[in-house]
């Protein structure tokens, strides 16, 4: 699942 908001931004999402 993609998570592209600051609460869960990581090196593998955005």
From Swiss-Prot:
Q: What is the effect of changing residue 9 to G?
A: Important increase (22-fold) in ability to inhibit fetal muscle nAChR and loss of ability to inhibit adult nAChR that permits to strongly discriminate between the two types of muscle nAChRs
**PTM annotation (Cysteine amide): residues:** 14
Q: Which GO terms describe its molecular function?
A: acetylcholine receptor inhibitor activity; toxin activity
Compartments (UniProt record): Secreted
Quote the record's domain comment: The cysteine framework is I (CC-C-C). Alpha3/5 pattern.
The UniProt keyword set, sorted, is: Acetylcholine receptor inhibiting toxin, Amidation, Disulfide bond, Neurotoxin, Postsynaptic neurotoxin, Secreted, Toxin
Distribution of this protein across tissues and organs: Expressed by the venom duct.
Query: Additional info?
Result: Negative results: is not active on all neuronal nAChR tested (alpha-2-beta-4/CHRNA2-CHRNB4, alpha-4-beta-2/CHRNA4-CHRNB2, alpha-4-beta-4/CHRNA4-CHRNB4, alpha-7/CHRNA7, and alpha-9-alpha-10/CHRNA9-CHRNA10) (IC(50)>10 uM).
What exactly does this protein do?
Alpha-conotoxins act on postsynaptic membranes, they bind to the nicotinic acetylcholine receptors (nAChR) and thus inhibit them. This toxin inhibits muscle nAChRs with moderate potency (IC(50)=11 uM on alpha-1-beta-1-delta-epsilon/CHRNA1-CHRNB1-CHRND-CHRNE (adult), and IC(50)=13 uM on alpha-1-beta-1-gamma-delta/CHRNA1-CHRNB1-CHRNG-CHRND (fetal)).
**Record's family?**
Belongs to the conotoxin A superfamily.
* Covalent S-S links between cysteines: 3-8, 4-14
Q: What is the effect of changing residue 10 to K?
A: Moderate increase (3-fold) in ability to inhibit fetal muscle nAChR, and loss of ability to inhibit adult nAChR, that permits to strongly discriminate between the two types of muscle nAChRs
The listed outcome for residue 11 to K is: In MilIA[Delta-1, M2R, M9G, N10K, H11K]; important increase in ability to inhibit both fetal (820-fold) and adult (450-fold) muscle nAChRs, as well as gain of ability to inhibit alpha-9-alpha-10/CHRNA9-CHRNA10 nAChR (IC(50)=0.5 uM)
In which organism is this protein found? Answer: Conus milneedwardsi (Glory of India cone snail)
This protein is called Alpha-conotoxin MilIA
Location, primary (coarse class): secreted
What are the annotated GO cellular component locations? Answer: extracellular region; host cell postsynaptic membrane
């Amino acid at each position: 699942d993609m998570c592209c908001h600051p609460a869960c931004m990581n090196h593998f999402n955005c």
